[in-house]
């Protein structure tokens, strides 16, 4: 199995995760989408020096991982490429903000270090929330919920087609990579001199495949918009989940939970 086939397998694993059964999976897609958006907004609203305040925001993703039955290690494995890029956002903060902000065990910690850690946690928490949304909601249901929320149909169509076509492109890349290695056995990767023709062939194959897909869509009744499957109505448990989640986020945002718990333990 080459790298492209492994990537295709990981894409299918996301669909398998979304097809599982759990209380989180059974919630209305709109409730999960809105709660995720609220979580991300409130998470990024923390001050760059409020490291102690943002740590309790980890409680919500951890709780959802436990209820949904999705292992936390699966999340970090799927995000292994994106996580280093997100965590590198504040990597240079310690060099620009060197003023001491607090003392930790007799060691002065600069504001740049604190802001770097805060930015890293913000990125990690937001990625975890986004992964949970995708891992517990099928893409078709998510797109149907977006249309229910009056998101422009063109944007929803682009999202769905992009998600689906990534798998198609990965499949084409897997076939081309296998063909290349059969013609160049024992060679690691694709030689620099072959990249021009390789990318040209990929472009031609993707254009042909896109024409075939579009013709198939027209034969199945596609006319500028998709006919999404009906999703169940928004029920009381969905509303309670959404309301409870937002109230929980506001509690973590407005109340210094770390200081409150610290005061209880000190007593």
Sequence positions of predicted segments:
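Membrane-helix interface segments
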Residues: 50, 71-72, 152-154
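Membrane-helix interfacial "entry" motifs
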Residues: 21, 25, 69-74, 103, ...
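Interfacial helix-loop-helix linkers and transmembrane-helix boundary segments
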Residues: 53, 71-79
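Short helix-capping/hinge motifs at transmembrane helix termini and TM-loop junctions
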Residues: 47, 68-69, 96-97, 138, ...
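Transmembrane alpha-helix interface motif
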Residues: 1-51, 56-66, 171-267
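Juxtamembrane/interface alpha-helical elements of multi-pass membrane proteins
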Residues: 78-185
């Amino acid at each position: 199995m080459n790298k492209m086939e492994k990537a295709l397998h990981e894409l299918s694993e996301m669909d398998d995760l979304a097809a599982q059964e759990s209380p989180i999976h059974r919630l209305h897609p709109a409730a999960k989408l809105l709660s995720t958006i609220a979580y991300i907004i409130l998470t990024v609203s923390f001050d760059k020096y409020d490291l102690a305040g943002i740590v309790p925001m980890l409680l919500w993703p951890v709780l959802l991982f436990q209820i949904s039955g999705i292992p936390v290690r699966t999340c970090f494995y799927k995000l292994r490429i994106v996580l280093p890029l997100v965590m590198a956002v504040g990597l240079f903060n310690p060099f620009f903000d060197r003023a001491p902000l607090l003392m930790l065990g007799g060691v002065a910690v600069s504001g740049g270090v604190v802001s770097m850690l805060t930015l890293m946690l913000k990125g990690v928490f937001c990625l975890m929330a986004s992964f949970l949304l995708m891992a517990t909601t099928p893409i078709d249901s998510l797109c149907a919920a977006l249309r229910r929320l009056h998101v422009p149909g063109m944007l929803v169509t682009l999202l769905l087609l992009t998600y689906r076509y990534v798998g198609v492109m990965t499949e084409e890349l897997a076939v081309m990579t296998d063909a290349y290695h059969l013609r160049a056995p024992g060679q690691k990767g694709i030689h620099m001199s072959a990249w021009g023709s390789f990318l040209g062939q990929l472009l031609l194959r993707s254009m042909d495949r896109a024409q075939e897909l579009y013709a198939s869509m027209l034969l199945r009744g596609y006319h500028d918009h998709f006919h999404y499957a009906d999703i169940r109505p928004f029920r009381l448990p969905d509303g309670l989940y959404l309301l409870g989640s937002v109230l929980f986020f506001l509690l973590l945002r407005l109340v210094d939970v770390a200081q409150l718990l610290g005061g209880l333990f000190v007593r």
